[in-house]
Regions:
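A short, N-terminal "cap"/entry segment at the start of jelly-roll beta-barrel domains
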Residues: 1-43, 144-157
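Short glycine/proline-enriched turns and hinge-like loops at secondary-structure junctions
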Residues: 60-62, 80, 104-106
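Glycine- and acidic-residue-biased ligand/ion/polar-headgroup-sensing regions
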Residues: 54-55, 62-79
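Conserved short histidine dyad/triad with adjacent acidic residue
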Residues: 43-61
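Short acidic-glycine-tyrosine-enriched beta hairpin
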Residues: 80-96
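Ligand-binding loop in jelly-roll beta-barrel domains
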Residues: 88, 96-121
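Acidic/histidine-enriched, glycine/proline-rich intrinsically disordered or flexible terminal extensions
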Residues: 120-157
Length: 157
């Protein structure tokens, strides 16, 4: 099965207007612009282009987020009160559940990959399951094949 490959010239992506939740805004203009660039086949992750203007706000990461800054700068203060600067070329990762305070003096533009977190035993089980399929030589595991294999294994127990 062929999957679609993400390819975008970021300067030509039409962004949609959004905003930072009003009760999270500390100062400035909470308007944002973003566009989902692509989603994973399991719908647990997506890539997004996101930007904002001069603003300061609190942020709660309800998904894992990894990103690279394209332009502008942001100053993030973590829960321990430590401030870090992020500028063009910088890469960051914020696990789900992280809280931070952000300040953008002018503008900030990033490409981010957001991923839903799953309960650790489920994630480990999935990795073991996929490894088992690779070991026995099954590399293209369709949902139908997985369902039939699971049903068969259940009936044979």
């Amino acid at each position: 099965m062929s999957e679609s490959i993400l390819s975008a010239t970021l300067g030509y992506v039409e962004l949609e207007t959004g905003s930072i939740p009003a009760d999270w805004v500390l100062s400035g203009n909470p308007q944002t612009r973003s566009k989902i660039l692509g989603r994973s086949g399991d719908l647990l992750a997506h890539a997004i282009l996101w930007e904002c203007g001069a603003v300061s706000y609190k942020w709660h990461y309800n998904q894992d987020e990894a990103y690279i800054v394209l332009s502008g700068e942001g100053f993030m203060t973590d829960e321990k009160g430590v401030e870090r600067r992020f500028g063009p070329g910088d890469v960051a990762f914020f696990p789900a559940g992280t809280n931070a305070t952000w300040r953008h003096p002018d503008h900030f533009r990033k490409v981010a990959v957001l991923k839903e977190s799953v309960w650790r035993p489920v994630g480990v089980g999935l990795k073991v399951w996929k490894k088992l399929f690779r070991v026995i030589g099954i590399t293209d595991t369709s949902p139908l094949l997985l369902a039939v294999t699971t049903w068969t294994a259940w009936k044979l127990r």
